[in-house]
C-alpha cells in the first residue's frame, strides 16, 4: 500500500493486492470485502475530520491476478435461495475482478482501479497484461496525476 502526504495533508492512498491460485473463490470474497471495508473506513474517517481538513484525497486500488486456467475458467454458481445477477453467470474470477473494480469506481468508493494479470513466468519478468481497457494502469496513474496537479495548483 502507498500513502501520499503533502505538507501534512493526505493527498492519495493506493492499495495494491495480488492473488494467485489455487483457491480463487475464498480469496476473491476476502479481497472484495477488504476493498469495500477499507474504502468505507477511509471515507468515514474523512467525513469525521480525521485528516485535519484535508481536501478530498484520491483513492486507488490495483489488483494483480495470476493468469492461469483456474482464473479464466467459468465459476460454478449455486442459487439455493436467490437468483444471482446475470452478469455473474458463466464468468471467471478474472471477469469477476473486472466487475468488482468497475463497481468500486462506479460507487465512488475508489477514484480509479487497475486490473493487471500475469502468468507466473510473466510476473517474474515484470510483464503483465491488462484484460480490460477501462482498468489499465495508464488511466489509473493519469487520474492520480490529475488529482496531484489539482492539489499543487491550489497551493500557488
Regions found by a protein language model. Give the residues of each.
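Short, Lys/Arg-enriched charge-dense amphipathic segments
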Residues: 1-3, 70-90, 134-149
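Charge-rich, low-complexity intrinsically disordered segments
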Residues: 116-156
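Generic detector of bulky aromatic hydrophobic side chains
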Residues: 1-2, 21-24, 43, 61, ...
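Active-site beta-strand-loop-beta-strand hairpin of nuclease catalytic cores
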Residues: 3-13
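Acidic, metal/cofactor-coordinating or nucleic-acid-engaging core segments within structured domains
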Residues: 23-121
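Short, histidine-centered active-site or binding-site loop motifs used for metal coordination
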Residues: 16-20
Amino acid at each position: 500500500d502507498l500513502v501520499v502526504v503533502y505538507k501534512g495533508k493526505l493527498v492519495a492512498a493506493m492499495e495494491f493486492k495480488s492473488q494467485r491460485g489455487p483457491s480463487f473463490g475464498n480469496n476473491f470474497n476476502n479481497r472484495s470485502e477488504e476493498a469495500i471495508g477499507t474504502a468505507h473506513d477511509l471515507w468515514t474517517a474523512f467525513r469525521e475530520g480525521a485528516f485535519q481538513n484535508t481536501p478530498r484525497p484520491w483513492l486507488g486500488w490495483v489488483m494483480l491476478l495470476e493468469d492461469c486456467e483456474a482464473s479464466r475458467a467459468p465459476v460454478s454458481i449455486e442459487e439455493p435461495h436467490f437468483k444471482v445477477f446475470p452478469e455473474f453467470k458463466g464468468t471467471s474470477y478474472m471477469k469477476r475482478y473486472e466487475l468488482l473494480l468497475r463497481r468500486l469506481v462506479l460507487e465512488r468508493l475508489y477514484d480509479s482501479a487497475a486490473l493487471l494479470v500475469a502468468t507466473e513466468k510473466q510476473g517474474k519478468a515484470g510483464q503483465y497484461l491488462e484484460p480490460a481497457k477501462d482498468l489499465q494502469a495508464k488511466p489509473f496513474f493519469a487520474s492520480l496525476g490529475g488529482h496531484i496537479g489539482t492539489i499543487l495548483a491550489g497551493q500557488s
